[in-house]
Amino acid sequence: MASQGTKRSYEQMETGGERQNATEIRASVGRMVGGIGRFYIQMCTELKLSDYEGRLIQNSITIERMVLSAFDERRNKYLEEHPSAGKDPKKTGGPIYRRRDGKWIRELILYDKEEIRRIWRQANNGEDATAGLTHLMIWHSNLNDATYQRTRALVRTGMDPRMCSLMQGSTLPRRSGAAGAAVKGVGTMVMELIRMIKRGINDRNFWRGENGRRTRIAYERMCNILKGKFQTAAQRAMMDQVRESRNPGNAEIEDLIFLARSALILRGSVAHKSCLPACVYGLAVASGYDFEREGYSLVGIDPFRLLQNSQVFSLIRPNENPAHKSQLVWMACHSAAFEDLRVSSFIRGTRVVPRGQLSTRGVQIASNENMETMDSRTLELRSRYWAIRTRSGGNTNQQRASAGQISVQPTFSVQRKLPFERATIMAAFTGNTEGRTSDMRTEIIRMMESARPEDVSFQGRGVFELSDEKATNPIVPSFDMSNEGSYFFGDNAEEYDN
């Protein structure tokens, strides 16, 4: 497995730590989420939110966005140098929803970024606690992954909308560090690289001069991140070619798109972490839970436990289905937007439906929406079982390449067959195998053709009862894997627009 040697576990990336043992990792992740919780409690006090208002996920998101904006140095610098009308670069804010006379009202608040930074540092023992900020970014990214489709972005970069399952983390900001890089899908990395190459094609100075040198370093770093996600020698060799190219152009874009397609069967390793809204950590801290002492993990039972005991509310629009809103948030909490619906349904204990069948829009509410008709409901975020989150793509036979599914990137380490339409995927690989990467392309296509949909992934891995915190008795579910289990099936979600 890839975790030996120099690779750090996600928790180490998450907390910026060097190699630590399991107890130290649990403690530092605990310290991170505890800091988020303390910050949230303090913000609720500042804003004079009632207990109910503090548990409203929309308020949580506004508070999270404020602290992310307060620490976004690059944007803050940009705003100060390019003053735009009506935007104070030193302030941040957003909508806070309050309960007044049996109705919800929206209040726009504004705070000094300096003040927010002070409250955040105070909650995190005087440190900047970048890891906690990244954690919030990943929660927002997971929520976007579950809520929006990226068809337009895929088509714009010359990729195929059917590659949507490779797009995890596509809305993460660049500054999300190693922990952010770990959760980005193959398609996300490919898209970032293609955008970069296209700029280089259109702008002669992009790779030149002092700036160009920095650009080049960033390009090679992104190539290495993507290379690290691939699990076969041929895919990695192709990434070396892309990285070493003197001036990257259309040939590299072709190679990258080829690699992205190949990842539908020879899947990359993409990390999954359960990142919860700040209000959930706040509730736990407020009830006296000591995260640092107890320890915490983003990939084990802890987030499931936390959600079993947390009551979070959400605003609901007049024609939305509260159960569907709950499903959306549940998927976001467990980073399960790209997981097979049958696996998610089994773990959750209620049927998880494809996005095309959801009667709900996103969680956030636009400033022009009418508050008069808004209602609020409890989100049902509990689960029947828990399972370990995975970082492998679910390729079988000793983590070499094998069967994948055209629209799934597994989240949970649970045994299943990964059905895929080989014919559909292979159709995309007709033709071009000449050029400098021909032997690698031929090798990749050969591996894909020999992949068998009936191979079992995560052999022997199962889910666990919530009472089984040491994961001693795996329950291996049996699924009817005859049909497509993708969340994006019959998709009609709105596009993600910044």
From Swiss-Prot:
The keyword NAD does not apply. Residues 1-21 are annotated as: Disordered. It is found in: Virion; Host nucleus. Keywords: Capsid protein, Helical capsid protein, Host nucleus, Host-virus interaction, Ribonucleoprotein, RNA-binding, Viral nucleoprotein, Viral penetration into host nucleus, Virion, Virus entry into host cell. It comes from the Viruses. Late in virus-infected cells, may be cleaved from a 56-kDa protein to a 53-kDa protein by a cellular caspase. This cleavage might be a marker for the onset of apoptosis in infected cells or have a specific function in virus host interaction. GO terms for biological process: symbiont entry into host cell; viral penetration into host nucleus. A motif (Unconventional nuclear localization signal) lies at residues 1-18. Belongs to the influenza viruses nucleoprotein family. HAMAP family: INFV_NCAP. This is Nucleoprotein. The gene is NP.
